[in-house]
């Protein structure tokens, strides 16, 4: 939560650190679906897996149905374990330190400014652990990146299951 009525959704590719960010007025399944579509559209490779916290906006049936339909594995982290989502947590900190300190959250242009900053982050900003930009890393890995058909061949819908916010129910359904 950035401010009242202002929430940031963040996706980070585990390997390249490519970043997709968007701002919404609330955390809902509908906004999550919109964000997933945005991520799939903006990432230059097929998405194989979504890892999230256990927020209701991510565990909603509509969200899980879309991921299953698109052949994307859904992997929520354990409750109260934000360290398991470390790359996203770090990316959010970077956005706070490098973007939000420079802008007015009430600006009518906030969404456009965030998109411009995302472009800067992915194409121009050298990432500390990679010593290159996320897009440079992506181009470096492109020859060995699986295409959509290859990723779909690895997806086994029968091995996927529904996740619930209730850990006991999840444990029961896992058996």
Residue ranges with predicted function:
Residues 16, 56:
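Short, glycine/acidic-enriched loop or turn micro-motifs at the edges of active sites
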Residues 18-22, 76-77:
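Short small-residue beta-strand/loop micro-motif enriched in glycine and branched aliphatics
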Residues 22, 48-53:
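Short catalytic-loop micro-motif centered on adjacent basic/acidic residues
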Residues 21-45:
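Active-site beta-loop-alpha junctions of metal-dependent nucleic acid enzymes
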Residues 52-54, 60-68, 74-97, 108-115, ...:
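RNase H-like two-metal-ion nuclease catalytic core shared by retroviral integrases
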Residues 38, 65, 69, 119:
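Surface-exposed charge patches
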Residues 1-12, 18, 31-34, 160-175:
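Mobile-element integrase/transposase regions
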Residues 70-72, 94-175:
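C-terminal domain-tail junction helix/linker
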């Amino acid at each position: 939560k950035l401010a009242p009525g202002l929430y940031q959704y963040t996706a980070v590719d585990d390997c390249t650190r490519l970043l997709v960010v968007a701002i919404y007025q609330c955390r809902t399944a509908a906004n999550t679906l919109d964000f997933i579509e945005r991520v799939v559209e903006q990432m230059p490779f097929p998405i194989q897996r979504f890892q999230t916290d256990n927020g209701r906006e991510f565990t909603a049936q509509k969200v899980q149905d879309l991921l299953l339909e698109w052949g994307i594995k859904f992997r929520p982290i354990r409750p109260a374990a934000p360290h398991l989502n470390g790359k996203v947590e770090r990316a959010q900190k970077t956005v706070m330190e490098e973007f939000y300190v420079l802008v007015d959250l009430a600006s009518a242009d906030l969404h456009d400014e965030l998109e411009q900053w995302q472009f800067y982050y992915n194409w121009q900003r050298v990432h500390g652990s990679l010593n290159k930009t996320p897009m440079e890393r992506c181009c470096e890995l492109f020859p060995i990146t699986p295409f959509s058909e290859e990723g779909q061949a690895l997806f086994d819908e029968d091995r996927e299951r529904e996740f619930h916010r209730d850990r006991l129910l999840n444990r029961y359904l896992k058996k």
